[in-house]
Amino acid sequence: GGAVLDGKVYRGHTSNALEIGHTTVDPNGPRCNCGNLGCLEAMSSGTAIAKKGKEAVSTNVETSLKKYDTITSYEVFKEAEAGDEVAKDIIDNALTYLGIGVANAIATFDPEMIIIGGGVSKAGDIVFDTVKKVVNKRCFKSMAESCEIVPAGLGSDAGVVGAVALAIIPPLVVEGALFSDWVYR
C-alpha cells in the first residue's frame, strides 16, 4: 500500500505507512504471513482466494474447481463467472473483505481516488463493482460518491515497479529534508 499526499509519497515515521493489506478485517480470520490474524491480504488476495479454492477441493463439497490440477485465483474467478456456487462464495467473501478494507481507508483518509492493483484487480468489473457496492454501503454517502476507485495502470506489476522506482529515482524532498538523508540516518 501507499499514498501520495500533497504531491509527496507518504512513508510514515518508520517508512511502513499505509500497509492497508495488513490491517485486520476479520479478527477471527486466518493467520497472515505477517503473523497477524485476519489481515485484508489473508482474506482477499489472489493467494487467499487460491487457498480457499484448494480447501474447497479437499472437502466433499461439489464444485467444478475439482477438475483442475492446479488452482489459482484465476480458476476460482473463472468458475465463479460460470456459476459454480462454491467459487462464487469464495469470490464474494474475498471481494466483500476487500470492499471493507477500501471503505476503512476512505473513512480514514477521505481520498479523491483509491487505486487497486495486484493480481485480483485483473479480474476486472466484478472486483470494482463489488468493492464499490461495499463502499457505498459502509461509507458516508458524500465520501463514497466523491472517491474514484480504479485499477492500477501497472496491474499486478505495480508493487515491483514501485519498489524499483523508490530505489532509483532521485531523492525526494520531504518537508524540507532530502528523503535519502532521512532514510539513511
Model-assigned labels for residue ranges:
Residues 9, 24-31, 36-185:
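ATP-binding/phosphotransfer module of carbohydrate and carboxylate kinases, centering on a glycine-rich
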Residues 1-4:
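Short beta-strand scaffold segments in enzyme catalytic cores
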Residues 16-19:
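A short acidic/small-residue loop/turn micro-motif
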